[in-house]
Curated annotation (Swiss-Prot):
InterPro entries: Helicase_ATP-bd (IPR014001), Helicase_C-like (IPR001650), P-loop_NTPase (IPR027417), SEC_C_motif (IPR004027), SecA (IPR000185), SecA_DEAD (IPR011115), SecA_motor_DEAD (IPR014018), SecA_preprotein_X-link_dom (IPR011130). This is Protein translocase subunit SecA. The gene is secA. SMART domains: SecA_DEAD, SecA_PP_bind. One of its GO terms (cellular component) is cytosol.
Amino acid sequence: MFAPLLKKLFGSKNEREVKRMLKTVSIVNAFEEKMVALSDEQLRGKTAEFKERLAKGETLDQLLPEAFAVAREAGKRVMGMRHFDVQLIGGMTLHEGMIAEMRTGEGKTLVGTLAVYLNALSGKGVHVVTVNDYLARRDANWMRPLYEFLGLSVGIVSAFQPPEEKRAAYAADITYGTNNEFGFDYLRDNMAFSQDEKFQRELNFAVIDEVDSILIDEARTPLIISGQAEDSSKLYIEINRLIPRLTQHIEEVEGQVTQEGHFTIDEKSRQVELNEAGHQFIEEMLAQAGLLAEGESLYSAHNLGLLTHVYAGLRAHKLFHRNVEYIVQDGQVLLIDEHTGRTMPGRRLSEGLHQAIEAKENLNIQAESQTLASTTFQNYFRLYTKLSGMTGTADTEAFEFQSIYGLNVMVIPPNKPLARKDYNDLVYLTADEKYAAIIADIKESMKLGRPVLVGTATIETSEHMSNLLKKEGIDHKVLNAKYHEKEAEIIAQAGAPGALTIATNMAGRGTDILLGGNWEAEVAALENPTAEQIAQIKADWQKRHQQVIETGGLHVIASERHESRRIDNQLRGRSGRQGDPGSSRFYLSLEDSLMRIFASDRVKNFMKALGMQSGEAIEHRMVTNAIEKAQRKVEGRNFDIRKQLLEYDDVANEQRKVIYHMRNSLLAAENIGDTIVEFRKEVLDATISQHIPPQSLPEQWDVAGLEASLASDFAIKLPIQQWLDEDDHLYEETLREKLLSEITTAYTEKEDQAGLDALRTFEKQILLRVLDDLWKDHLSTMDHLRHGIHLRGYAQKNPKQEYKRESFSLFQELLESIKRDTIRVLSHVQVRREDPAEEEARLRREAEELASRMQFQHAAAPGLESEQLSEEGAEVAVASAPVRNDQKLGRNEPCWCGSGKKFKHCHGQIE
């Protein structure tokens, strides 16, 4: 009740923040005259001066006004661009670790230079994160002259980069790269076998461009470095033949069955479930195909893997559609990002779903993989000391940014007021009526000579619209994931008079549609253009620009609402940049996915009450509200999925931190002899306690078992029974001391034979190898636990609490196994005095052989489904997998680990 009044009196939180920052803007502006008077050399010298002042105890906040003034003046001299006052506010927002929401065309890239320059002065490095390699290179090369003028170095990281080049890029003051590459390099660093192999420094400050895309849309995608597992391609092919014989079970809303079948589909949660008839039918078919023994159930423990394959096949056929969720290109299934409309090369669906789609499309089925290292973007980016971001659409997700990342959203005022007109949605009964109305709207705009952008949610819809326009004889361009190579060319001229562009969400982000077309693209198309040619192109563009403005600017037509309001706002944002005129209109029908699944009943009843006829549309605020309510419902569900993913990954993340800290300490240590001594004592104590319970009577001791365990774990045969027979005073405590002494003596002899330095190096390599192998299998076990844990709910237990409890128990076992297996390998290695180089090489070779022979296996069955809120067949971003093959690698061939080094300079050193 009092909230509106208080807001009127004191302003919103955002307005108060802007007011606070405007005071600092005044101080920055006061420096401008002084900066203009400096020579280039003096202006450049300011960077060294700032670094010196930092070293003497000043803070970045104290330097901010003068540093921003320096960056602004450098921008004028080098780029010919001066930061507006609102851009200074954006720079302060980023420096303070917040998200700056800025409209299209407000110069986000230029805003970033302010915070990046200031924070790079600390010498700890700044990462500028983009959504793809193209944008990373474009922005880095665009801003490089500015940073280098100010005496700062710039690096770019990318996939398949030579290690030396990548290391230099990370050592630079400012490093550009994609979210995927930064995340994968973090994982690779934690698989390195020496400090020299690592790339990244301390994670200091990151500025994320299109922050909502990376921290929200990508949050459900785990980053996984994987190696190959067993080949199950034949099974996928067999299952794929059976799936089409299953039919869908359909019920009306009133519960009346209209079609008996074997499975049901829940479009809201994207789930497909076999019913009782379906289970019986598929079991019969599997038995006939020889995949299931006669009379056996799919739910038998040893058949759960088969059931997973059946569900993967069902989802592939019933939930994933070609040209909607994926396309087939060059014999591969390429997933389409629902938020950007772009393909995602290198990304695969998990739980066998990607292989099932490959089988459905009759493609070569790639082998399944085993996780070697993994994390999520949520947990990776929370490792940075300070995090900030920029986007055109963040305010709708402000709660999620705050609750998960601790990031506040600041809406930056535009430099010029928005002149775009956003019309109410038009809702039709059928899709055909909707498309007819869109064609009519296009024709009307084309008569005026206005450029038109038609946004579609899928490739399928964009191609359908294209076919309709061809029938009408209307010239147009199509931009979707199939024709992405023409993207720059199409977007460059999408604002020309009378231009018509049909595009998926690709046109919604990272693009700037200039009214009248892009004159710079025209100049770039010429070979060695003269000054006269450039002047003529500019003059022609100015005429076209004015012509488009007079006709009303770019008209954006959307063929349906997206699940997320952000994506809709991004599409609208293509029009009306920097105060230009423009308009937008959404056309919907009751047959659209969002309307059909989430909003149709209420709207359909409302339309019936109005007595709507074919071809009529409804334009009413109630309908728009109902649609936005449906969108909020979907957004809320997706937020719950991301939050749940984070809650589960937080458990794994704490374990990841412990293992990676242990690993980094190992790499940094010159000598781990004391660690091995400690391990040996702990393993021996545990082994003895297993056979001689503390404070037990000698009659309860399992002496034979202890002798066997010592022979197995420590490679030493000791006559313990004989000692006990000969010495009546050999009690438990004295026996422990005697055994430790004997084992230590045996290992000391090994040190003397091998040479202390060689054995110390060998110990480190063995411990790293054992840790990596056991961690890999632990990840696999955790994955299986995660996918099956929801079943505990049927036993009235909290799945999350059960997951935490069991994962903690598994982690304790992992830590004990690392100690035990390390000691076992070291104890079994036989050494003799050799030439030092040969000796070290042989020791490492034996270590490799022993470690590879050890079976670090966990008995586990793949889970059936994740919890109701979790995403079925979640995507995983897969790095160039460090696949370890059995065949011998040549010394000059690339190493199997994916580091980019030659084998002889990488893992070949320890083999």
